[in-house]
Amino acid sequence: MKVIVTGAAGFIGSTLVRRLLKRGDTVIGIDNHNAYYDPAIKEARLARFATHPNYTHMRIDLADRTAMEEAFATHQPQRVVNLAAQAGVRYSIDNPLAYIDSNIVGFAHILEGCRHNGVEHLVYASSSSVYGANTAMPFSIHQNVDHPLSLYAASKKANELMAHTYSNLYNLPTTGLRFFTVYGPWGRPDMALFKFTKAILEGEPIQVFNYGKHRRDFTYIDDIVEGVIRVLDRPAPGNAEWNSDQPDPGTSKAPWRIYNIGNNSPVELMDYIAALENALGKTAEKVLLPLQAGDVPDTYANVDDLVEQFNYKPATSVEDGINRFVAWYLDYFKV
């Protein structure tokens, strides 16, 4: 199978590319290698598979319409996984326009590429952040997500709406995956686990927001990628029982679906930090701070639909996942 993966030098994208290549797929990776965080780790991720005979890499921006049209026309993919986006809830507060270019304009170019080139299935990264002001736990795809708390969250909700439009108008199968706090080896340096590990090893204090009372449904990278692959292999069907008088937000008569991919087991931030301290054999100096603008206190994924449709549920414990991350970190940075 020939697959375009956008964000191929990113955390989730690079891990997915390796899995697809390992099983024999042909992969065209797209990434703009921006400097949102240190590009060196992107290059290091890419180096693990850049010379694979079934891999082609393209350094282009999703917002570049001509380049994206050429990528689709040249390679004619059967499936597409969009993992490229301007990430970060907090960054979106100070840099909103970056999210429009990548997450809205760029996604429109992907949808157009799929539409005009006979793509069989588009899978794209949404986010748990779309649940916004909702506090009904666990978060279900059958709940409305109409109150985002950041432009990042709004852009991800917009992706879901744009995808539905294309599924409805052009019969393009699309599936959105709401990822819940992904962590693990080769992670993003701007995320808490990476920052905490660096600070603790250097004897620096760590900033703990919401006084450590956050609960997050931390989900290990390999569990995320396994979910992506299972979904990718089964193009989204329409829901024949969908009722327009009582519309279900998670399905449609069109070939459009949404799924949560989370560990279904939220962990308090202080417990997450304790697991990291145990893995490092060091105690963190903590600076307790209030909840930041745009953040939500808790996330908790209801994965019943994922289990029902794909017989799959993430299961890696925080302790095991953090131990694997720390082992990778110490080796990668030669600490």
Label every PLM stretch briefly.
Residues 66, 104-112, 190, 222-225, ...:
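Conserved active-site region of classical short-chain dehydrogenase/reductase
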Residues 158, 162, 166, 196, ...:
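Hydrophobic alpha-helix immediately C-terminal to the catalytic Tyr-X-X-X-Lys motif of short-chain
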Residues 1-182, 312, 324, 328-332:
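N-terminal Rossmann-like NAD(P)+-binding domain of SDR-like oxidoreductases, especially those catalyzing
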Residues 40, 93, 173-176, 190, ...:
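Non-catalytic, surface-exposed connector residues within folded enzymatic/regulatory domains
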